[in-house]
Design a protein with these regions (language model features):
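A metal-dependent, Asp-based hydrolase signature
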Residues: 29-33, 37-93
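Extreme N-terminal segments of fungal proteins
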Residues: 1-6, 24, 29-31, 45
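Short, acidic loop-to-helix structural element flanking the phosphoryl-transfer center
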Residues: 61, 65-66, 83-124, 160
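Generic structural signal for small/hydrophobic residues in well-ordered secondary structure
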Residues: 11-14, 72, 124
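A general structural signal for well-ordered alpha-helical segments in protein cores
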Residues: 23, 40-43, 69, 163, ...
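Tryptophan-centric aromatic hotspots in well-structured domains and transmembrane helices
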Residues: 19, 101-104, 144
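Asp-based, Mg2+/Mn2+-dependent phosphohydrolase catalytic module
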Residues: 1-8, 112, 123-235
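Asp-based phosphoryl-transfer active-site loop
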Residues: 3-22
């Protein structure tokens, strides 16, 4: 008999949030829409690369606003044709946009079902700062039992110590917890410490991952969060 689930831990951006629309809308209006879209995707990937480098070099966690500022400047170096449009005010607006995002349409109801219909604890567990997560939960209208940021935990996902610290704080065993994410690297980290995993496919994320490989790696693979509670109940 499988161990009953007690908690569901969500990655945030991409998994629960349509970060792409928020960032695209904050970029200078003269830039063509398709260029803004690709710029946002590349900026996001550069952020991931920066975090990976910090982990590899055993560096401490960094304020996500600083990382976004640094990577934005690197992006502008790669795009000298549009760089003049990014005045200091525009740069500040683009960075602030990461703090104000909308949830994917089905997410709010999915979280409600997990909490009310099943009685599971529901948490955010994601890289970033606590202030970022607080701002986004308000702008997206989402409610969680607790927000666990890399800033709070002192390490980035997918380092094992990040997941183990959350389990320690929650006083739960790995098999009692499910991680839900749109990022394969995150779920690989969760799986490495024996947590159960559900992958959510989002068009804005994991564009370089082989989805067939990702599907095989996880306990469940879903196209969105409709029926997520039923999927988790079967794990």
């Amino acid at each position: 008999m499988s161990t009953p689930i007690k908690a569901v831990l969500f990655d945030f951006m991409g998994t629960c949030l349509d970060w792409h629309s928020s960032i695209v809308s904050a970029l200078p209006s003269p830039i063509p829409q398709h260029v803004k879209s690709q710029f946002a995707l590349d900026w996001r990937q550069m952020y991931f690369d920066a975090n990976t480098a910090r982990i590899k070099n055993s560096q401490p966690t960094e304020n996500i606003d600083i990382t976004h500022q640094t990577t934005l400047l690197q992006m502008l170096d790669k795009h000298p044709d549009i760089a003049p449009l990014f005045t200091p005010e525009v740069q500040a607006r683009a960075i602030a946009a990461w703090h104000h995002q909308k949830a994917w349409p089905e997410v709010r109801e999915a979280i409600r079902k997990l909490k009310e219909d099943h009685g599971w604890e529901v948490y955010v567990h994601a890289n970033g700062t606590t202030r970022l997560q607080l701002n986004i939960t308000r702008s997206a209208g989402l409610q969680f039992d607790m927000l666990f940021s890399s800033e709070l935990l002192g390490s980035y996902k997918p380092a094992a110590e990040n997941y183990l610290r959350v389990l320690e704080l929650l006083k739960l065993r790995p098999e009692e917890c499910v991680t839900v994410a749109a990022h394969a690297y995150d779920l690989r980290g969760a799986k490495a410490v024996d947590m159960k995993t559900v992958y959510v496919r989002r068009v804005t994320d994991d564009i370089l991952e082989d989805q067939e490989v990702v599907r095989r790696e996880n306990d469940a693979y879903v196209e969105d969060m409709r029926g997520l509670d039923e999927v988790i109940a079967r794990l």
